[in-house]
């Protein structure tokens, strides 16, 4: 089934070219189906790129998904035009009285700042509180996951000595968890971050459970017992070239950055990256939508 997106959203042509089923709003109104209402809070600088990555995954499921895009009002985006935001995005005031089946909170390149130093922290706190009462299940990604764990449970983040950068092998910690259905015993996920959340801090909170982790990159998936809040530390949504783009950008600036691990053949950045996380990403988002959004949400929100 398709994702429902606004006419002329830049991601539309890209996804259609990839054979992803996209439906525009006018056609969706003619169908007698209640689509899942999914809100994406996009905190990433390159918003069009992130939109496309997430819509690609949401559109590759049997469920019809009506996507709404949300941006932070208290922060001025320097990498996405005002015209794009005005045309395709809403603010929290626009949606605060609505109910949503699911919500995604993306990462953001602010992890070296203390949470309270982030200029939109107060607004983000209001949105995260809104997710408790107005959203069936919320999926937090990377810094969004760290921020969610800090806001909801007071769990701190810790600065890494060196950036966690590459594609790392992960294993499963739990059996019988619906979010993990169909996962291989070992699978790979990209990470790109300067901070981490410690295992011992999660274990202090009885409501939280560690579903997946990596010997090299640490925690990957943490969730509440009912999976109303899911915290994903990696970037399974990344394009094949996302880590390459980050590496090339930082190298061009003269920054001291290592080649992303397990990404290029023989760690040779002159070669094409090896994509080994795509099937995992599709399964993660499909399981979340099916088991924790679609199966748990009423036909009509009261």
From Swiss-Prot:
**Amino-acid positions noted as binding substrate in the UniProt annotation, renumbered to this chain:** 163, 192, 249
- Which top-rank group of organisms is this from? Bacteria
Which SUPFAM superfamilies is this protein grouped with?
A: Class I glutamine amidotransferase-like
Pathway assigned in UniProt: Amino-acid biosynthesis; L-methionine biosynthesis via de novo pathway; O-acetyl-L-homoserine from L-homoserine: step 1/1
Q: Which Gene3D superfamilies match?
A: 3.40.50.880
This protein's record includes keyword Acyltransferase:
yes
Provide the top EC class.
transferase
In chain numbering, the residues marked as site (Important for substrate specificity) are: 192
Q: Which reaction does it catalyse?
A: L-homoserine + acetyl-CoA = O-acetyl-L-homoserine + CoA
User: Is Transferase tagged as a keyword?
Assistant: yes
Site description Important for acyl-CoA specificity, residues in chain: 111
Instruction: Quote the catalytic residue positions.
Output: 142 (acyl-thioester intermediate), 235 (proton acceptor), 237
Q: What is its EC number?
A: 2.3.1.31
- Where in or outside the cell? Cytoplasm
| Pfam families named in the record | HTS (PF04204)
A Gene Ontology molecular function term of the record = homoserine O-succinyltransferase activity
What does the entry list under GO cellular component? cytoplasm
> InterPro entries, per this entry?
Class_I_gatase-like, HST_MetA, MetA_family
Q: Which UniProt keywords apply?
A: Acyltransferase, Amino-acid biosynthesis, Cytoplasm, Methionine biosynthesis, Transferase
Q: Which family does it belong to?
A: Belongs to the MetA family.
Main function: Transfers an acetyl group from acetyl-CoA to L-homoserine, forming acetyl-L-homoserine.
This protein's name: Homoserine O-acetyltransferase
Question: Gene for this protein?
Answer: metAA
């Amino acid at each position: 089934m398709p994702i429902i997106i606004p006419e002329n959203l830049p991601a539309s042509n890209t996804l259609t070219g990839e054979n992803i089923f996209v439906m525009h709003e006018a056609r969706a109104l003619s169908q007698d189906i209640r689509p899942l209402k999914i809100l994406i809070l996009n905190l990433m600088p390159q918003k069009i790129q992130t939109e496309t990555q997430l819509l690609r995954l949401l559109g590759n499921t049997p469920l019809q998904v009506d996507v709404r895009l949300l941006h932070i009002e208290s922060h001025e985006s320097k990498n996405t035009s005002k015209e794009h935001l005005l045309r395709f995005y809403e603010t929290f005031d626009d949606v605060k009285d609505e109910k949503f089946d699911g919500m995604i909170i993306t990462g953001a390149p602010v992890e070296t700042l203390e949470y309270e130093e982030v200029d939109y922290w107060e607004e983000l706190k209001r949105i995260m509180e809104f997710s408790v009462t107005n959203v069936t299940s919320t999926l937090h990604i990377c810094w969004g996951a760290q921020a969610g764990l800090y806001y909801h449970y007071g769990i701190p983040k810790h600065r890494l000595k060196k950036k966690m950068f590459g594609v790392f092998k992960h294993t499963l910690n739990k059996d019988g968890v619906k979010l993990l259905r169909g996962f291989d015993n070992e699978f790979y996920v990209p990470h790109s971050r300067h901070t981490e959340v410690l295992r011992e801090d999660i274990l202090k909170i009885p409501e939280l459970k560690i579903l997946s982790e990596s010997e090299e990159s640490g925690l990957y998936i943490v969730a509440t017992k009912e999976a109303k809040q899911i915290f994903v530390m990696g970037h399974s949504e990344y394009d094949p070239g996302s880590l390459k783009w980050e590496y090339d950008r930082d190298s061009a600036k003269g920054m001291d950055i290592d080649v992303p691990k397990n990404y290029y053949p023989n760690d040779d950045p002159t070669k094409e990256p090896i994509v080994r996380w795509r099937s995992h990403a599709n399964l993660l988002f499909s399981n979340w939508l099916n088991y924790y959004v679609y199966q748990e949400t009423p036909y009509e929100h009261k």
